[in-house]
């Protein structure tokens, strides 16, 4: 097991500044190369304190911005135009990247596709819902209107 310091939020592990213990391969092959974590060192304690101080300063501003974004997201129906067959079944399915792109196109704001959660695969036209994790303590429900392209 390896001790690492998270530099970004990682779903299921923790947020930036947390010290977590993960399997060696996960740390060596994924977290460190992707920039999500750095190896724990003796100077790591100072790094953790600096990361946490920076996060606390951003926390106030980001919570206010997240609440504004939540209000916008929940007040708007996001329209997705996708290829579909005659009976309304999609060719493929709607992905989180498609939802993020549609939200951006609607002028609501930019979302990270990794923070969007679809309860189940969207494979038909109609109204669907998705959850967006905006902050550690705040999430928003988006109404997606999936329509067939002409």
From Swiss-Prot:
The keyword Plastid does not apply. The keyword Ribonucleoprotein applies. One of its GO terms (cellular component) is ribonucleoprotein complex. Transmembrane segments: none annotated. It comes from the Bacteria. Keywords: Ribonucleoprotein, Ribosomal protein, RNA-binding, rRNA-binding. GO terms for biological process: translation. Gene3D superfamilies: Ribosomal protein L9, C-terminal domain, Ribosomal protein L9, N-terminal domain. GO terms for molecular function: rRNA binding; structural constituent of ribosome. It holds the Pfam family Ribosomal_L9_C. PROSITE patterns: RIBOSOMAL_L9. Binds to the 23S rRNA. Belongs to the bacterial ribosomal protein bL9 family. This is Large ribosomal subunit protein bL9. It comes from Leifsonia xyli subsp. xyli (strain CTCB07).
